Amino acid sequence: LDALIAIGGDGSLSILHELARRGNWNLVAIPKTIDNDVACTHWSIGFDTAVNTIVDALTRLTFTAASHDRVMVVEVMGRTAGHLALHAGIAGGADCILIPEIPYSIEAVCRQINDLHDRWGRRFAIVVVAEG
């Protein structure tokens, strides 16, 4: 065995880290996680696909929310990292994005949604929430 290549997220890369700590291995780590939460990387494999899939869903939900005067809350994956919710929410035109890195209160979220109605006459909203 000349080298070990690990393609994965936190779990796979933590195993690789442990191998590096224990011995003299030639190791290559390739981040692959939709969470996009691997340190020292800008993008990970899978993140862009996940963002675009969520944006497609948000586009469809926006039409449904508008036609039925609803507030739609969409929970996206990401564990304790809000990268996926933030990027997809911005690209998908969400009215409110809630991520674990920024504390929020339900009261503030309700005020923001009510402001859409009071200021712009909007009778619907899209809220994206990271699962963490």
Locate the predicted segments by residue.
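Short glycine-aspartate micro-motif
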Residues: 4, 27-29
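Short gly/pro/ser/thr-enriched loop/turn and capping motifs at secondary-structure boundaries
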Residues: 13, 33-38, 104-106
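Accessory alpha-helical/coil subdomains and C-terminal extensions
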Residues: 6-8, 16-18, 23, 47-132
